[in-house]
A protein has these predicted regions:
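Generic hydrophobic, helix-prone segments enriched in Leu/Val/Ile
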Residues: 230-231, 242, 337
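Short intracellular "coupling" helices and adjacent cytoplasmic loop segments at the cytosolic face
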Residues: 225-235, 249
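Short amphipathic alpha-helical segments embedded in low-complexity Lys/Glu-rich regions
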Residues: 68, 235-243
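Transmembrane-helix signature of 12-pass secondary carriers
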Residues: 2-223, 251-448
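Flexible, disordered linker segments and immediate boundary regions flanking tandem C2H2 zinc-finger modules
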Residues: 233-237, 424-426
Length: 448
C-alpha cells in the first residue's frame, strides 16, 4: 500500500515537473564540468608530453611520474571529498574542487622547471579527486526522478567530451614549440573558473539539507530546481520521500541481528547529545518538522551518524551492492583505457605514425590529430551508452564491452610485438653530418 502511494506521488511529481526540465539540465551541465575537467586532464597530457619531454629534457621515468602523480593525488582527494561532502555539503565541496583545479592549471601554465610542473599536476589531481566524488552525488540528488538516469550519465559524457576538446587543443597549439604546452595545460583553468563562478548561486542538494535537518532550506532548493510549477504539497511529498529513504536505511540496519560494540554505542546516544548548544533557532524548525512528520534537527543528526561506510558494510543488501559497484569500477580501470588515453600520442609515435615525415611539426600535428580521433571515438560511443543500457540487458552490455576491450588490447599488444621484432624504428630520424658523409664518399671514390 505504501509503495503504491509513493508510486502515485512519483507520477504526480514527474507529471508536474516534466515541463520544468531546463533548470535541472543547466545545473547538471555546470556540475558535470567537474567530469569535463577530468577528461581534459586525461587527454591534454598526451599531446603536451610531446613538447614537455623536449622542453624539460624528461626521462621516460619522469614522464611516467608526471602522468601518474595526478592519479595518486586524485586517489587521496576522493576519500577526503567523501567526508567533506557529508559535513559541509556537496555544493561547497564542488566549489573547493573548482578552486583547486583552477590553481593547478595556472601553476602548470607558468611552470619554469620540472618541480613546478609536478606541483601543478599534483594540485590538479587533488581537484580531480574531490570533483570525481562529489559531482555524481550532487547530480543524482538534484535530479528529478524521471530524468535522473539520463542526467547522471551526462557526467560520463562530459568526461569523454573533455578528452575530445583536449585533443583538439593539443592539435591547435602543437605547432608552437616554445609555449604550446603552456596553453594546453593552462586552458583547463577556464572551465573550472566558469564552474566556480556559476556554483556560487547554485542550490545545495535538497537531500543533504533534509539529512541535516534543514528542511526549510530544502524546500527553497527544490523550488529553485524544479521551478514555480512545483507547488507546496508536491515539495512536501518530495521531502517526505527523502526522509523515508533515509529512515529505510536505519530500519534495515536495526533489522540485522547484530549486537557489536558500534551498535550498542550508537543505541546509547541520547538525543540531547546530538543537539548543538547555542542553536536556539532549531527548536522552531523542530516544531514545524514534527507537525509535518519530518525528523527534527537532532534526529537528523543522529540519523546522519548512522550513514557511514562501516554501517554500509554491515548491511547485507548495501554490502553486496557496494562490492559489485566498486568491483566493476576497479575492473574498468584495470582494463587499460587510462593507459591508452594518457599515452595515445606516444603509442601512435612508437607505432611509426608520421615517421617518414622529415617535417617535425607536421609529424607531431598528425600524431596529435589522430590521438584526438581516438578520444572522439570514445566520446561517440559514450553518447549512445544511455540508450544501449536502457534497451539491452546490463550484463549483456557488460560482456560485449569487455570482450571488445579484450580483443582490442590483444591486437594492440600483438601489433607492438610485430613492430619490435620485424620493423626498424621509423619515428626517430638520426642526425648525420653532411660534410663527413661527403668526405667518406670522396675517399671511397679516390680509392677506387
Amino acid at each position: 500500500m505504501a509503495t503504491r502511494l509513493i508510486d502515485r506521488e512519483d507520477n504526480l511529481v514527474d507529471r508536474t515537473i516534466c515541463h520544468s526540465w531546463v533548470c535541472p539540465v543547466v545545473i547538471t551541465c555546470l556540475s558535470a564540468l567537474g567530469g569535463f575537467l577530468f577528461g581534459y586532464d586525461t587527454g591534454v597530457i598526451s599531446g603536451a608530453m610531446i613538447q614537455l619531454r623536449e622542453h624539460f629534457n624528461l626521462s621516460y621515468a619522469y614522464q611516467e611520474i608526471i602522468v601518474s602523480i595526478s592519479l595518486l593525488a586524485a586517489a587521496i582527494g576522493c576519500p577526503v571529498s567523501a567526508v567533506l561532502s557529508d559535513y559541509i555539503g556537496r555544493k561547497i565541496v564542488i566549489i573547493i574542487a573548482s578552486v583547486i583545479f583552477t590553481i593547478g592549471a595556472i601553476v602548470m601554465g607558468v611552470s619554469y622547471d620540472k618541480i613546478s610542473l609536478l606541483t601543478g599536476r599534483l594540485i590538479v589531481g587533488l581537484g580531480i579527486g574531490v570533483a570525481s566524488m562529489s559531482v555524481p552525488v550532487y547530480i543524482a540528488e538534484i535530479s528529478p526522478g524521471h530524468m535522473r538516469g539520463a542526467l547522471v550519465t551526462l557526467n560520463t559524457v562530459f568526461i569523454t567530451a573533455g578528452q575530445v576538446v583536449a585533443g583538439i587543443v593539443d592539435a591547435i597549439f602543437i605547432s608552437d614549440e616554445v609555449n604550446g604546452w603552456r596553453y594546453m595545460l593552462g586552458i583547463g583553468g577556464i572551465p573550472s573558473f566558469i564552474q566556480l563562478v556559476a556554483f556560487i548561486n547554485m542550490p545545495e542538494s535538497p537531500r543533504w539539507l533534509v539529512q541535516h535537518g534543514q528542511t526549510q532550506k530544502a524546500r527553497v532548493a527544490l523550488q529553485r530546481i524544479y521551478g514555480e510549477s512545483f507547488v507546496t504539497i508536491q515539495i512536501e511529498n518530495e521531502i517526505q520521500r527523502m526522509v523515508e529513504a533515509l529512515r529505510d536505511v536505519e530500519l534495515s540496519e536495526t533489522s540485522q541481528a547484530t549486537s557489536d560494540v558500534v551498535q550498542n554505542s550508537n543505541a546509547n546516544i541520547d538525543e540531547e547529545d546530538c543537539i548543538l548548544p547555542g542553536k536556539t533557532s532549531q527548536f522552531s524548525e523542530d516544531a514545524r518538522n514534527r507537525d509535518n512528520g519530518l525528523p527534527s534537527v537532532s534526529e537528523s543528526s543522529c540519523l546522519r551518524s548512522k550513514l557511514t561506510l562501516i554501517r554500509m558494510l554491515r548491511l547485507k543488501t548495501t554490502r553486496r551492492a557496494l562490492f559489485i559497484g566498486c568491483g566493476l569500477q576497479m575492473f574498468q580501470q584495470f582494463v587499460g583505457i587510462n593507459t591508452v588515453m594518457y599515452y595515445s600520442a606516444e603509442i601512435l609515435s612508437m607505432a611509426g605514425i608520421g615517421g617518414m615525415n622529415n617535417n617535425k611539426k607536421g609529424e607531431n600535428a598528425k600524431i596529435v590529430w589522430l590521438s584526438a580521433l581516438v578520444a572522439f571515438a570514445n566520446f561517440l560511443f559514450s553518447l549512445g551508452a544511455p540508450w544501449i543500457v536502457n534497451t539491452f540487458k546490463r550484463r549483456l552490455v557488460l560482456y560485449c564491452s569487455l570482450t571488445g576491450v579484450f580483443l582490442s588490447l590483444v591486437v594492440l599488444a600483438v601489433s607492438f610485438q610485430l613492430i619490435t621484432s620485424y620493423s626498424i624504428p621509423v619515428s626517430v630520424v638520426e642526425s648525420t653530418n653532411v660534410t663527413a658523409v661527403g668526405v667518406n664518399i670522396h675517399t671511397s671514390c679516390s680509392k677506387a
